[in-house]
């Protein structure tokens, strides 16, 4: 079990309050020990966002998921890995780090001071969605067991990661903010 919140699906957009800083406190279920989000942690399970758009574009994973950390050019990256899967975590972490390093070489300066990959390992389904400082990706639990599946998750993560630049920062004004 876990909790996952996509704020764009559950928060109301209030233009009157959109420009100012936002605060969020999470009270996890008593059995859940971890919260992963790209929002700035200000202690415990309390978070802040610069404005409503940043809050709305910051998904939240709550539970007892695995957390793996790495850096790309001194920028902290984290993987929040929910659900059982037969994965070589050392190889997977190294491959995700290599992908992120190569992406930054292609595009140049990194637009974030931190980044979060939320990965849901499910019985079925899949896909991903980019966010301002993170992505949420869903794959089947067996994804890591075949070369084709493993290449698929790496392609998905690379695709969503490139959206840091193309879509989240390089886009028509109509797709603002």
Residue ranges of predicted features:
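Juxtacatalytic substrate-recognition/specificity segment
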Residues: 66-177
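Extended, low-hydrophobicity, Ser/Thr/Pro/Gly-biased non-transmembrane segments
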Residues: 1-61
């Amino acid at each position: 079990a876990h909790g996952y919140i996509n704020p764009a699906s559950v928060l109301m957009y209030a233009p009157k309050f959109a420009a100012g800083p936002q605060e969020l406190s999470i009270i996890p279920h008593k059995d859940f020990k971890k919260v992963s989000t790209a929002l700035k942690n200000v202690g415990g399970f309390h978070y802040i966002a610069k404005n409503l758009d940043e809050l709305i574009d910051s998904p939240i994973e709550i539970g007892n998921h695995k957390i793996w950390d790495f850096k790309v050019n001194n920028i902290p990256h984290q993987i929040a890995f929910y659900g059982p899967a037969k994965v070589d975590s050392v190889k997977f972490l190294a491959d995700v780090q290599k992908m992120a390093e190569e992406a930054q070489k292609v595009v140049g300066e990194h637009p974030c001071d931190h980044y979060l990959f939320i990965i849901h390992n499910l019985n079925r389904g899949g896909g991903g969605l980019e966010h301002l400082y993170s992505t949420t990706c869903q794959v089947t639990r067996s994804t890591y067991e075949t070369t084709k599946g493993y290449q698929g998750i790496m392609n998905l993560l690379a695709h969503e990661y490139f959206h840091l630049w193309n879509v989240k920062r390089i886009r028509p004004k109509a797709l603002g903010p």
